[in-house]
Amino acid sequence: MNIFLKKPLHPILIGKIGKAYGILGWVKFFSFTENKEKIFSYFPWFILKKKWEIIHVDKWKKHNNNFIIHIENILDRSTVSKFTNLEIFIDKSILPILKEDEYYWNDVIDCKVFNSRKEYLGKVINLIRNQNNDVLIIRNNLKKNNFKKIMIPFIHKKIVKYINVKHKIITVIWN
């Protein structure tokens, strides 16, 4: 882990700042990590305005299903409002090293997806979480200047048969 980074070498999106909360410089904050509170153990946090900047959170609290955070040295609503809708990144190097068959969501982005008949379905552009399971969002642009999004449930072994994040390939049982 390199705590002296001035910008992330391998940025990973981990959250997003919402609108101002109160008048004392607090903002709503949405964690994209699986264990939402785990986000507060990853530092430094980076934002991208015109260039990468580090932000320091000096306080945080649970608020409904998410959080409110206080950014160091910001004491009023108008100043903190400038952070609304900014995405929070960390550098991949600070994440724990995973076992061989494990991966982070961001590792799945840009994987090529094929069905069991080896037909190309598209490329993973996002993942979303719903109540039942995660969902792969795949962009299919087989026709020139025309694309569609395919949503495939991320159900290991039943629908998602094979994942190789190193070679960026996923095989699914899907028509």
From Swiss-Prot:
<dbReference type="InterPro" id="IPR011033">
    <property type="entry name" value="PRC_barrel-like_sf"/>
</dbReference>
<dbReference type="GO" id="GO:0006364">
    <property type="term" value="P:rRNA processing"/>
</dbReference>
<dbReference type="GO" id="GO:0005840">
    <property type="term" value="C:ribosome"/>
</dbReference>
<comment type="subunit">
    <text>Binds ribosomal protein uS19.</text>
</comment>
<dbReference type="InterPro" id="IPR009000">
    <property type="entry name" value="Transl_B-barrel_sf"/>
</dbReference>
<dbReference type="Pfam" id="PF01782">
    <property type="entry name" value="RimM"/>
</dbReference>
<keyword id="KW-0690">Ribosome biogenesis</keyword>
<keyword id="KW-0963">Cytoplasm</keyword>
<keyword id="KW-0143">Chaperone</keyword>
<dbReference type="GO" id="GO:0043022">
    <property type="term" value="F:ribosome binding"/>
</dbReference>
<dbReference type="InterPro" id="IPR011961">
    <property type="entry name" value="RimM"/>
</dbReference>
<dbReference type="InterPro" id="IPR056792">
    <property type="entry name" value="PRC_RimM"/>
</dbReference>
<dbReference type="GO" id="GO:0005737">
    <property type="term" value="C:cytoplasm"/>
</dbReference>
<keyword id="KW-0698">rRNA processing</keyword>
<dbReference type="InterPro" id="IPR002676">
    <property type="entry name" value="RimM_N"/>
</dbReference>
<dbReference type="InterPro" id="IPR036976">
    <property type="entry name" value="RimM_N_sf"/>
</dbReference>
<dbReference type="Pfam" id="PF24986">
    <property type="entry name" value="PRC_RimM"/>
</dbReference>
<comment type="function">
    <text>An accessory protein needed during the final step in the assembly of 30S ribosomal subunit, possibly for assembly of the head region. Essential for efficient processing of 16S rRNA. May be needed both before and after RbfA during the maturation of 16S rRNA. It has affinity for free ribosomal 30S subunits but not for 70S ribosomes.</text>
</comment>
<feature type="domain" description="PRC barrel">
    <location>
        <begin position="100"/>
        <end position="174"/>
    </location>
</feature>
<dbReference type="GO" id="GO:0042274">
    <property type="term" value="P:ribosomal small subunit biogenesis"/>
</dbReference>
<protein>
    <recommendedName>
        <fullName>Ribosome maturation factor RimM</fullName>
    </recommendedName>
</protein>
<comment type="similarity">
    <text>Belongs to the RimM family.</text>
</comment>
